[in-house]
Regions:
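Intrinsically disordered, low-complexity segments enriched in small/polar residues
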Residues: 1-63
């Protein structure tokens, strides 16, 4: 199970806020959704047993 996670690297011209500013248990961002594009970002998770892992998913959006 994941205890906390961090989001970083969202495009600051499209997403507000563009990251979680450290480890959190919840995160919300607002997407302007004014560009048809695919955006990359990084998720870093801390598991309950202390292990860390990361993933680089993508968000695809557009008008």
């Amino acid at each position: 199970n994941v205890a906390s996670f961090a989001i970083s690297g969202l495009d600051p011209t499209e997403f507000t806020p563009s990251g979680s500013n450290g480890q959190v248990t919840t995160f919300t961002t607002t997407d302007k959704n004014d560009n048809s594009n695919t955006y990359s970002y990084t998720v870093t998770a801390v598991h309950e047993d202390g292990r860390t892992s990361s993933h680089d998913p993508k968000i695809e959006n557009g008008t």
